[in-house]
Amino acid sequence: LNTGGTFDNAISGSGQVVKSGDDVLTLSGANSYSGGTLISDGTLVASNVEALGTGDVTDNATLELNTGGTFDNAISGSGQVEKSGDGALTLSGANSYSGGTLISDGTLI
């Protein structure tokens, strides 16, 4: 997805979602895709814990988690993870990302 804006529709299936381009893209649907997520450029915002499907996330740019709840997906890559939005968010996956963590709002557990 080489675009910005908000994508509200549900994404399903076994494929991978790839975020490219410098813009900010928000995924707000309750997605069930299983092929994982690759963030190669820009910022990908997840507005709920289901927004990134069930696969692992490779973050080589910026992943913004604008939600509370429990995020089960494993996060790897060289990019930054940002917690925004109200509420407490628990990262329960086997995370190995190296780009640092920014908490701009809410609580990260």
Question: What is the meaning of each model-derived region?
Answer:
Residues 4-14, 24-78, 90-109:
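Surface-exposed loop/turn positions within long extracellular repeat scaffolds
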Residues 87:
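Acidic/His metal-coordination segments adjacent to aromatic residues that form catalytic metal sites
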